């Protein structure tokens, strides 16, 4: 079975590579040192510092494994390969819900780069799925767990 690919911009991949480097070169050694110190306290069966450090080690190793997989199977998307006014990964899109005045701006990213707090939505999210492939002036229906709503695409531009 083929591995899942992770569509992303080159910038997203570089960010993941930096995060992986930080985990391997800084966080992993810090956790190993904490485990070593906790071991020196003696009896491991009732050593909460040791248990906490081992839990953190498992978390860090899980993050490393996840990032390595995403980087290994990264599919770099070139937003220049699609029409200038077409929504794709790496594009910034301004939308307006039909019947509302407020405009919303989103950056479409691969799942690895999603961060809703700063307006970066994944191509796999309901918003991303509804907008990908649409063009300026089109309308799209965004399906959410609590219902659907229609939006008009006001502007599509390459993300700076």
UniProtKB/Swiss-Prot annotation:
One of the protein's GO biological processes: regulation of DNA-templated transcription elongation
Protein's UniProt name: Transcription elongation factor GreA
Coiled coil: 1-72
Keyword line: Coiled coil, DNA-binding, Transcription, Transcription regulation
PROSITE patterns found in the cross-reference section: GREAB_1, GREAB_2
UniProt cross-references to Pfam families, sorted A to Z: GreA_GreB, GreA_GreB_N
Gene Ontology terms for molecular function: DNA binding; RNA polymerase binding
Species per Swiss-Prot/TrEMBL record: Streptococcus pneumoniae serotype 4 (strain ATCC BAA-334 / TIGR4)
Task performed by this protein: Necessary for efficient RNA polymerase transcription elongation past template-encoded arresting sites. The arresting sites in DNA have the property of trapping a certain fraction of elongating RNA polymerases that pass through, resulting in locked ternary complexes. Cleavage of the nascent transcript by cleavage factors such as GreA or GreB allows the resumption of elongation from the new 3'terminus. GreA releases sequences of 2 to 3 nucleotides.
Keyword NAD in annotation: no
Gene name linked to the record: greA
Similarity-based family: Belongs to the GreA/GreB family.
């Amino acid at each position: 079975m083929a591995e899942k690919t992770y569509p992303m911009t080159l910038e997203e991949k570089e960010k993941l590579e930096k995060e992986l480097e930080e985990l391997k070169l800084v966080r992993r050694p810090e956790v190993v040192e904490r485990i070593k110190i906790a071991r020196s306290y003696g009896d491991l069966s009732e050593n909460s510092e040791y248990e906490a450090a081992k839990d953190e080690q498992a978390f860090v190793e899980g993050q490393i494994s996840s990032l390595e997989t995403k980087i290994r199977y990264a599919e770099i998307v070139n937003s220049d390969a699609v029409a200038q006014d077409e929504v794709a990964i790496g594009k910034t899109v301004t939308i307006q819900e039909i019947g509302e005045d407020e405009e919303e701006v989103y950056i479409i990213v691969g799942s690895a780069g999603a961060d809703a707090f700063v307006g970066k939505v994944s191509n796999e999210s309901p918003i991303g799925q509804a907008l990908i492939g649409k063009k300026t002036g089109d309308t799209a229906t965004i399906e959410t767990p609590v219902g659907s709503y229609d939006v008009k695409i006001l502007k599509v531009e390459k993300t700076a």
